[in-house]
């Protein structure tokens, strides 16, 4: 498989304060994790902490063709394997990180118009990304999405069909 090259407009930041490590992502979210307690983290400060920021939300440059040059070179090599590319997110994960998960779940009910607009922005960027991945020579995409816990989904099937199926 292959993924996107680094961004021209984003530089990853990482810093430690006491026992807590902070880092950012391309969307502008600030994450944190315990230095000696976890390898992952959780969103500490979401990029979209106020719906009034939605119109001006800075999107990652996943649709910059330069980010696909290494991928195209990789996929241009002869192989007998299926050429898969990693997609940098999906509508549910990216959107819930932008709002912070516990807020995002409330937003699904209380701020449906804003949620639909956010999902459209994220989906639009990911659609452009998929097209560029295809132009780079990928034959398929892979994305990771955590839609549930061990014994159930996080969102009921009716809401899922209404909110996410269109995207």
Please provide the spans of the model-predicted regions.
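Short glycine-rich loop/turn motifs that provide flexible caps or phosphate-binding loops at active sites
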Residues: 2, 27, 147
